[in-house]
Amino acid sequence: MSNLKTKLKMSCLYLFVVIVAFFIIRLSLFLLCFDYFSTLSNNEIFLSFLNGFRFDFSSIAIFILPLVVFLFIPVNSKAYTKIIFTLMWLMFFVSLLILAGDVVFFSIFNKHLETELLSVQTHFSFILQTALQSYWYVTFSIFLLFFITLYFTYRYINKNFVFQSQPKFILKSILIILCIGLIMLACIRGKWDFRGKPLGIMDAQLLGSQKTSELILNGIFSSAEGLRRMEDRTCFLDKQEAINLARNITPSEQEIDSDYPFYRYKKDFSFGTGDYNIVIIFLESWEREYYEQYPEAMPNFVEITKNSLYFKNFYNSGSRSLTSTTSTMFSIPYVWGLPFITNGLGAKNMSRMASYFKEKDYSTIFVATDNASADKIGEVANYSQFEQFYAKANIPVTHKYPTYTKGFDWEGFELFFNKINSSKNNFLGFFYTSSTHGPWDMILLKEYQLYPQTTRDNQFLNRLYYSDAAMGNFFNLAKQQPWFDKTIFLIFPDHHVPFPNRTYDSNLRDADKYFTSFLAIYAPKIFKPQQIDTYATQEDILPTIIDLVHSSQPYSSDTNSIFDKERSKEIYIYAENKKVYIVGPDIYEEIDLSNINKVKELIAEDKLSYYQKKAIARNEAIYHSLKNHKWHKKSNN
């Protein structure tokens, strides 16, 4: 068999394996998320799978076929052929991991991967540890399969590779490369007509409903499109119209510069002298459903809420830690078309939480029980101008724990207490738990096992019980200190627990399914216990603590202090899947901005409600302000 025939035969077999793998991944997505796709008809499902091949071929053409082109470069070398096939199989296994990761991601968030691949580096140590510990057998199997594949590939090349005469070999190689090039162009465009634009996500949306398009797409295609269009988004409103609709300066605030529509300072404070310590306790994956249904799993927190200002209409700003952290620390929601704080958004000017305490000579202390590299939390804390930062590597472990990829809240809370207790000044403290982060299949401390480890919920509840005990120990220590009486604690979760294929009460509204939360403002010597109906999100935390300590520094936000009586009654939640939820005392509305043509049609026909239009305006105004450096003035902060 000639060299070219060997390459052609092996290439066809390779591409067949790749196409089958893409199909199996789509089938896995459909079966794993069957409840989500169950509303599709049989015809819609069939057409989705059929159209899915177009988007699979496009992904293969962009990321895999270029290596096949290199294979047919007229190099008459057995070693060269082995190197290219090694790269081809490596690309296949990497693609397989991305596709499989996308299925898991979709089962949690009901959206495909987009720019999330950029955050892989921030979770690399966690992913690696999880792969080598909790899923070592899967990791081992993948590596074993990879090397077995290489073994048989090399063996076949050694057996069938023969050298060819140069003139014919070169000519045939060039013809094959030209044919592959034409196929690549056709696949990238999704048709044989080479005019017009390449295949895009909108093409999938035009083929049917939102769920149809989601079944058509794959994680590689959606990620490539998301990264390509990271700073390019469709804006539905005129820029100035969006800014005018989005302005929300209340009478207690003062606008500073009309060119900076969200830049203001607080001129009238809600109450008190401002001479308070502030402590934020950011709870990994805690949520209201577990608090209400399993109070025995968090007895210390239940006791705290009885003596707190308890905001029962508090909502998370996102489904992921990075979104919630950005909202909490910088008062910026999820903004489509802009990168995450750790991938470029940090280059924009914005309000930095700890800076508002420097003018008052506060100590600023941030403790995270997770690794500093997780979501680059160390960099985020430093960017927020916290003077002291401590993470898992800085926390002495005093209990005997099993091997766990995250950190231990008991020792973390103790370190946090020691650091704020040693402060000679007032302080801002930020504590970020992580012991309730998955995987949950191991008991951290036997004495804090409340339930048998037989179900996923029980495993998580045992973690809650441990983390709650750690927080209870912290407050027992804090109550004995003189600074406790003038300290305001703000306690709230980052997001819901991300169980794959989690089922919710069908009677719940989507915003309540995915974002409902709680906020306890605990200061028994300052506030009388009360349940408060105010609607608020994590975006409100920064304006609120600025209000509490009477900071006169300018800040930028599209929201207001939670205590501001003139603030809007409704809140806006911008989900990572481009859905917007508007929630208030007498309002609940949604709008899906991923369906661009539908939104344009609603605008053209003037069918958007006032709140839907305002929701679009707010996000677009924030986008324009951040992108054009009109969000915050650097010189002041």
Where does each model-flagged region fall?
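Transmembrane and membrane-interface helices of multi-pass
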Residues: 2-234
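Short amphipathic alpha-helical patches
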Residues: 73-81, 110, 114-124, 128-132, ...
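Solvent-exposed soluble domains appended to multi-pass membrane proteins
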Residues: 251-637
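Alpha-helix initiation and N-capping motif
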Residues: 21, 124, 217-220, 239-243, ...
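Short alpha-helical "patches" and their helix-cap loops
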Residues: 82-83, 234-245, 341-345, 558-560
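Glycine-centered secondary-structure boundary/capping sites
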Residues: 59, 81, 110, 129, ...
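The feature marks either
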Residues: 205-212, 216-267, 274, 306, ...
